[in-house]
């Protein structure tokens, strides 16, 4: 009898421990990263990629990566006024400062930027700088994203973040991939924040969005933020390639 009670107790303790480990692995917090989103409307894809690949193999790009840890990739867009963006991620503001110092001082970078005059519609080029506010799971394991751009009333940012975090904590089983909330620190005239939801395929992403939006938790979230948030647009983002010198 005592042996059975001990077995039940140990089994319950094991379940509790596993639940603790699972909850701990699903932390939703800032990863500390900052990023440049450089938006382009590409008119000559071949010239555009040639310029990017040439710079990628340059000494300037190597120095840029080595001194700042810049993580650079190209993404395609649908549901946007732009066709692509180049994403440059740094671990923190100090690394971005190092990276900007190198990038803006070398001829190879200047030549690449000049080449965009013949491969993109430069009248429609723009950029912003974001800072991660909350993140769950590793976004770099996913290849397709829903990126939701919106504006939050000034002074209500923490209120929105708390509501969004509560929603995502309730939807961990419905979201197979990564997710995050970024604050747009610079270039925020029209957009103050973006939310991303990642997956490994468009069908997986679509199903995740449908599942989340069909819940009472989402209805509660939407109701709680409707007076402090204005939606701008939702973009489908797909991975194209990374630039790591190879």
Could you say what each language-model-derived stretch is?
Residues 1-9:
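Bacterial N-terminal signal peptides that target proteins for export
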Residues 8-17:
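Bacterial N-terminal signal peptides
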Residues 22-246:
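Short S/T/G/P-rich N-terminal loop/turn motif that feeds into the first structured element of a domain
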């Amino acid at each position: 009898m005592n042996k059975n009670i001990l077995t039940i107790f140990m089994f319950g303790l094991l379940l509790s421990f596993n639940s603790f480990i699972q909850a701990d692995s699903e932390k939703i917090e800032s990863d500390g990263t900052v990023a440049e989103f450089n938006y382009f409307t590409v008119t000559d894809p071949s010239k555009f990629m040639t310029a990017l690949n040439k710079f990628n193999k340059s000494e300037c790009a190597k120095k840029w990566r080595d001194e700042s840890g810049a993580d650079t990739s190209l993404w395609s867009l649908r549901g946007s006024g732009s066709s692509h963006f180049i994403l440059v991620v740094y671990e923190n503001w100090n690394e971005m400062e190092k990276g900007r110092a190198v990038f803006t001082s070398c001829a190879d970078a200047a030549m690449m930027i000049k080449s965009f005059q013949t491969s993109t519609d430069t009248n429609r080029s723009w950029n912003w700088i974001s800072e991660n506010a909350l993140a769950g799971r590793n976004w770099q394991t996913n290849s397709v994203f829903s990126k939701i751009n919106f504006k939050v009333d000034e002074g209500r940012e923490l209120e929105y973040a708390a509501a969004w975090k509560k929603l995502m904590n309730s939807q961990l089983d419905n979201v197979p991939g990564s997710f995050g909330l970024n604050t747009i620190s610079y270039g925020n005239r029209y957009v103050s924040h973006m939310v991303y939801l990642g997956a490994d395929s468009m069908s997986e992403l679509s199903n995740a969005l449908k599942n989340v939006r069909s819940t009472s938790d989402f209805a509660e979230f939407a109701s709680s933020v409707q007076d402090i948030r204005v939606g701008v647009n939702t973009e489908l983002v797909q991975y194209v390639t990374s630039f790591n010198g190879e």
